[in-house]
Structure formats: C-alpha cells, structure tokens
C-alpha cells in the first residue's frame, strides 16, 4: 500500500535537542491537537535522543527517571489518548549520537520494550 504523503509528525530534536522531558512532550502533543495539525494529517509525536539513562538495567534500556518520571508506557498512553501515534528514537549502533545506549546486540529485547510501551514508530 502506498501513502499519498510521507509520515508526518513532530520530532523533539529539531527544536529542543537533548532538553526534553515528560511535561514538554505532553505540551507539544496538546499543541499538535489544539492548533489543528493533528487534523491536518500530523499523526506522530517522536521523542528523539536523550530520553534514556546512560546505562542499561538487566539488558533493558531505561527511560531517564528525572526527565520521564511516569515512564514511557504512561507517556505513550497520553499521546494515544490525544489521537496521536507515539514515536521514539534509537540507533542501530552501540551508542546513540549523544553517546547513550542504543540497540546494537539488544535488538530483540529493545523491540519488546518498545512494543510494551506502545511505540508505533521507531526512528
């Protein structure tokens, strides 16, 4: 199936870089809805690099507890409740561009975690 337009949405990196947190993502999600962008076809809210802790726990990526105190599942649920899709960033290397843990050699466990958080799109 072909789409008439590419996937459209908002990505945290373009404006905020690593300066992201749960409240900001909720505010940007709300703005996509209130400004009519969601209804115009913008469907993704994508959290880019700097969402994770600097070390894995038991092989799992861990959301930064200071930035995302409710966790990614709760944030994904919030995004979905607004009629949007939840996107996240990872990398195919050992580390992301910022030097945080990425998915190389952890692809299956990371995919399961992303799915359990309700992630719809992986950048």
Feature-to-residue mapping (PLM):
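Aromatic-lined carbohydrate-binding/catalytic grooves of carbohydrate-active enzymes
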Residues: 27-123
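An acidic-aromatic substrate-binding cleft motif
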Residues: 1-17
């Amino acid at each position: 199936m072909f789409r008439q337009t590419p996937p459209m949405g908002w990505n945290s990196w373009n404006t905020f870089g690593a300066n992201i947190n749960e409240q900001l993502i909720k505010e940007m999600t709300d703005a996509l809805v209130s400004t009519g962008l969601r209804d115009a076809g913008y469907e993704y809210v994508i959290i880019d690099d700097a969402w994770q802790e600097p070390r894995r726990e038991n092989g799992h990526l861990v959301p930064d507890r200071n930035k995302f105190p409710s966790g990614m599942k709760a944030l994904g649920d919030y995004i979905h409740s607004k009629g949007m899709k939840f996107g996240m960033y990872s990398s195919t290397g050992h580390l992301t561009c910022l030097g945080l843990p990425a998915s190389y050699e952890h692809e299956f466990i990371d995919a399961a975690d992303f799915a359990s958080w309700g992630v719809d799109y992986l950048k």
